Amino acid sequence: MKNIGYYNGETGLLEDLKVPFLDRVSFYGDGVYDATMALDGVVVFAEDHIDRFFNSCANMEIDPGIGREELQHLLTDLVAKVDGSYHFVYWQVTRGTAHRSHPFPEGNANLWVMVEPEEKNLQPAPIQLLTVEDTRFFHCNTKTLNLLPNVVAAQHAKEAGCEEAVFIRDGFVTECAHSNIHILKDGVFVTHQADNLILPGIARKHIIASCERLGVPVEERPFTKTELMDADEVIVSASVSYTHLRAHETLMN
């Protein structure tokens, strides 16, 4: 298949599937998600992403109606049905289908999955970053579907000719619109600590582990916009891109 979608047990091409009008995602963005890549049929860091997904579910008090192992098998099975060897894998759960009312409805959650082929980008290239004010809410560690501030920031970056937007909160760098950001200065890897102001990125986790294996000092702490501008290197990381780390970024105020 050229792509595949899944909704509560029904599968088909993404352009053919339909979801109920009363799915709570329509009214409230009431759900959580996660995403990664698959390479040669293997969902990359699947356990890490699934653990984070279930943590998001717990934070938002959503029962996904599926277990970890069952979800991992489902993702792997769907990947196997799509053409190509490199895929974008996305899944989300919403808090069911019901007439619009703020309190939680009775009934089961809705599980969505989509898998699409992607092209590998293995060529290193510099990217440009735009700094923007971080006005998001204080639950950035939960991967909810409420992404409007990220969407607007990403659009402003695009309009400025940049590939990513960097959030600045009270003078400190938090993360980007859809990735984590880190700096290298005097041989030290510096990254914002994993608290409620950033998403605990899976790529970030494995970069930190690699630094520890290689003997590179790691500081998990807030760093300022000035430190960002003065860094020896800026590293942007995300699980849904597969490329060499870029050793040079241009930053725009």
Q: What are these regions, as identified by a protein language model?
A:
Residues 1-77, 94, 99-246, 251:
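Helix-start/capping segments and mature chain N-termini
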